[in-house]
């Protein structure tokens, strides 16, 4: 691994993921299950811009970066859903990368792309590797001591017309997780095997009527069956979460532009309101609508979204002449 630990938390976070390679998804032989459009560049372009760039003969391969790839789940999809691309996947954990390499070997992902590099490196130490057409960094920046420095580093690797997909923790929907994290920290259980044992025991000994126990059973029990997933949720040594205002401030501080949520239906007030209340909500500016949803839905535990270096102006297709000139393309998710 490159020895430049650019973030103060890198050594402890790397050691944590060596103990608990994350995510704990099982390996499979053959392509990954289902279809995740967020990891298909052409689907992402269609969602963000309302159109895709025409394919041209001799066009260079798309360049993709999986920044903080963990055990390779996202890398696997990126390879299978972007055939012919050049893919660089990096992570600070040797243990997680060992699993990732085996995952891609078994799935045949490397054979789908022009090139695949899986390297033990920090996303802060990739100067000279860009530009990338698409950067995927899911669940990574909030584990840096300085998330802004991480976002600025990724911004510097992004092509002028590229897109960056991020997943960051949302403060409001993680209240029960935060309480459990603080309780386990007060109990000094650590973030190793003992912490895992005592963390699971906590949810067994709390009264059945306890809200923390009930919320864990209702929301997180299935997600944390794998040991690595439980540890990542409750024992992580470095974590930051955001509200909507703080998220937008982070994006702007990095010199980037918000380009839309990758789960837009979650942020639609119609999911929560109707009648006159919905009409009033619809009259608000988009950010105010999102702020309203944030206040009304205390279960939103993360933000998933796209950012760009330049402002995005999606094609609305309201002009008949533009629509008649367009050529259709079969959505890749139909395979």
Stretches found by the model and what they are:
Residues 29-61:
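Conserved alpha-helix/loop element of class I SAM-dependent methyltransferases that forms part
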Residues 133-146:
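A short SAM/SAH-binding and catalytic strip from SAM-dependent methyltransferases
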């Amino acid at each position: 691994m490159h020895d430049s630990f650019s973030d103060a938390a890198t050594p402890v976070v790397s050691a944590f993921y060596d103990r608990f390679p994350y995510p704990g998804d099982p390996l499979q032989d053959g392509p990954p299950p289902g279809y995740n459009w967020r990891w298909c560049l052409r689907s992402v372009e269609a969602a963000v811009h309302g159109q895709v760039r025409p394919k041209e003969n001799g066009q260079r391969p798309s360049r993709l970066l999986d920044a903080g790839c963990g055990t390779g789940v996202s890398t696997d999809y990126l390879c299978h859903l972007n055939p012919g691309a050049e893919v660089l996947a990096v992570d600070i954990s040797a243990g997680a990368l060992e699993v990732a390499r085996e995952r891609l070997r078994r799935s045949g992902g490397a054979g789908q792309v022009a090139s695949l590099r899986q390297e033990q490196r920090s996303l802060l130490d990739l100067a000279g590797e860009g530009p990338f057409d698409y950067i995927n960094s899911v669940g990574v920046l909030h584990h840096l001591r300085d998330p802004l420095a991480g976002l600025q580093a990724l911004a510097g690797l992004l092509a002028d017309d590229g897109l960056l997909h991020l997943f960051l923790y949302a403060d409001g929907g993680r209240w029960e997780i935060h309480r459990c994290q603080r309780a386990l920290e007060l109990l000094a259980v650590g973030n190793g095997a003992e912490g895992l044992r005592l963390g699971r025991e906590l949810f067994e000994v709390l009264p059945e009527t306890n809200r923390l126990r009930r919320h864990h059973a209702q929301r997180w029990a299935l997600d944390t069956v794998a040991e690595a997933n439980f540890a990542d949720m409750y024992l992580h040594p470095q974590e930051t979460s955001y509200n909507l205002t703080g998220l937008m401030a982070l994006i702007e501080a990095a010199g980037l532009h918000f380009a839309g949520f990758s789960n837009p239906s979650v942020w639609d007030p119609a999911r929560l309101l109707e009648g006159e209340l919905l009409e009033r909500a619809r009259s608000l500016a988009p950010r105010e609508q999102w702020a309203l949803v944030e206040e009304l839905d205390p279960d939103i535990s993360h933000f998933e979204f796209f950012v760009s270096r330049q402002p995005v102006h999606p094609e609305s297709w309201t002009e008949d002449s533009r629509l008649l000139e367009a050529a259709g393309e079969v959505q890749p998710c139909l395979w």
